[in-house]
Regions:
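Interhelical loop/hinge segments that connect adjacent transmembrane helices in multipass membrane
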Residues: 1-5, 169-177, 189-232, 275, ...
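Signature of the first transmembrane helix
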Residues: 4-62, 95, 99, 121, ...
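Membrane-water interface segments that mark the loop-to-transmembrane alpha-helix transition
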Residues: 7-20, 46, 55-102, 285-307
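Helix-loop junctions and terminal segments of transmembrane helices
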Residues: 24, 28, 57-74, 137, ...
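Interfacial segments at transmembrane-helix termini and the short loops linking adjacent helices
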Residues: 37, 102-118, 245, 285, ...
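Transmembrane helix-bundle signature of multi-pass secondary active exporters and lipid flippases
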Residues: 47-55, 224, 228, 232, ...
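Membrane-interface junctions at transmembrane-helix termini in multi-pass inner-membrane proteins
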Residues: 68, 124-147, 337-368
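Hydrophobic alpha-helical transmembrane segments
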Residues: 112, 116-119, 145-197, 368-372, ...
């Protein structure tokens, strides 16, 4: 199982480390510099709004499906046709709620125009994540790796052709959203074609009984995703009305590198969930400890080095990305970048607790984290703006990480050597597995 885990990590990280840094630090930064901080802050606030309600497109189905297919792969054909029907029903619910809350928040025509486009992007992205969960559950990590970056590759091609051409002078935030919409659409169609062929999908089923059964089983996952999305993205939603589009744009810019690093941590958790799910089903505590040890120090070592390095070089790094405006991003960036350490802990031990079914505990921790985030934001934003939101984000992430780490050690009785530094034999094993993967290309 460790071989499966390392193989999965190799393929997922290889694909994403090639593509996603270029997307985040090349295309997204290029878009923000082109359209301006305030317009990008407006976009980012609406995006965060749609992201928080994104759970209504899924209701925990994706995480439930990864765990369920990993433990019962023979169910993929039945579940694929039924869950696709559920996704279409959930789209209607998502649209009603997002537009309804938008009305209550006093959104105008410009907000609703952007909101409509971004809700479609969120639906397609949610559909892609669900389709990928089937590859993950079957431990088909090469296919998962391909579809984890295909949308970004297409966006790079589309946006790059506009940003680095005479079209740059006319480029606006809506072109950026249209590019996302096109890329997500192509990726979703291709992913559906591949997994549909493997599962012998003939049609999409709208089965009320199946819908209720799946949603009841996935409800705890849904609540967890909602709470984590809220405490991870509530900052800019609170920041915009209290401090304006400019401060929201500064926070978005400071948050971007953390977002890129968080994506790497997330990618480590992608193969972890199906692997942990199978190990928890078998009750193999020793293998759970071994798998945790395999990823703990690479994750923590990388997170600590990245946080310290980025914080020490905050001003030159922000100036490199945002030119003359970079110095205004540095104070918030110095704080928020340390969030990668608790985020890394969360992606390891939160994934383990999810695989073990300890969702009640995770939901309680996430609710407390959300409360902390809101309280610190309301306390600090009036005086410190984006910097206050940075402290709020770090506070919430840190509480969540410490709580999950302590609970995982207690419930799974993880021995002290789980957290030891990797030995030379571990490194040799990783190199051997990577070499084997290269030989089979």
């Amino acid at each position: 199982m460790q071989k499966k885990l390392l193989s999965g990590l190799f393929w997922v990280l290889l694909a994403n480390l090639i593509v996603k840094p270029f997307w985040m630090l090349g295309i997204e930064v290029g878009v923000q510099n082109t359209v301006g901080t305030e317009m990008y802050g407006f976009y980012y606030a609406i995006f965060s709004f749609t992201y928080i309600f994104n759970i209504l497109l899924d209701l925990g189905v994706t995480n439930f499906n990864t765990r369920n297919i990993a433990q019962h792969p023979q169910l993929i054909g039945k579940h694929l046709s039924g869950i696709l029907g559920i996704k279409i029903v959930l789209l209607g619910l998502y649209l009603m709620v997002t537009f309804g809350v938008g009305l209550l928040m006093g959104y105008g025509s410009e907000e609703f125009r952007l909101l409509g486009l971004l809700t479609l992007c969120q639906f397609l992205n949610s559909l892609i994540l669900y389709l990928r969960s089937n590859f993950e559950g079957l431990l088909l990590f090469r296919w998962d790796s391909l579809f984890s970056v295909l949308d970004r590759v297409l966006m790079i091609v589309i946006c790059g052709s506009m940003l680095w051409s005479p079209l740059r002078e006319r480029f606006n935030i809506y072109w950026f959203v249209y590019a996302q919409l096109a890329a997500y659409s192509i990726t979703a169609v291709l992913a559906l074609a591949v997994i549909g062929n493997k599962a012998h999908l003939k049609r999409i089923r709208f089965d009320r009984r199946f819908l209720l059964v799946i949603l009841r089983k996935s409800a705890p996952f849904a609540l967890l995703v909602l709470l984590m999305a809220a405490y991870g993205h509530i900052d800019s939603i609170i920041l915009r009305p209290l401090a304006g589009d400019g401060q929201a744009g500064i926070f978005a810019g400071a948050f971007r590198i953390l977002d890129a690093l968080s994506m790497i941590a997330y990618l480590v958790s992608v193969p972890l969930l199906p692997v942990y799910s199978r190990l928890c089903k078998n009750g193999d505590r020793q293998q759970i400890a071994n798998s945790t040890s395999t990823v703990f120090w690479p994750m923590m070592g990388g997170a600590i080095v990245a946080a310290l390095g980025c914080s020490l070089c905050a001003e030159p790094l922000m100036t490199l990305l945002y030119h003359e405006n970079g110095i205004t991003y540095a104070p918030a960036f110095r704080v928020v970048i340390f969030g990668i350490i608790p985020i890394g802990i969360t992606y390891i031990f939160g994934t383990l607790l999810t695989a073990g079914g300890y969702l009640k505990h995770l939901n309680r921790f996430a609710a407390i984290s959300l409360g902390l985030n809101i309280a610190v934001n309301l306390l600090l934003i009036p005086r410190y703006g984006a910097l206050g939101s940075a402290w709020a984000s770090l506070t919430a992430q840190s509480f969540m990480a410490v709580a999950q780490l302590a609970l995982a050690i207690r419930l799974f009785r993880l021995p002290p050597n789980t957290f030891r530094l990797p030995q030379m034999s571990d490194i040799k094993q990783i190199i051997k597995i990577i070499k084997t993967n290269n030989d089979t290309l």
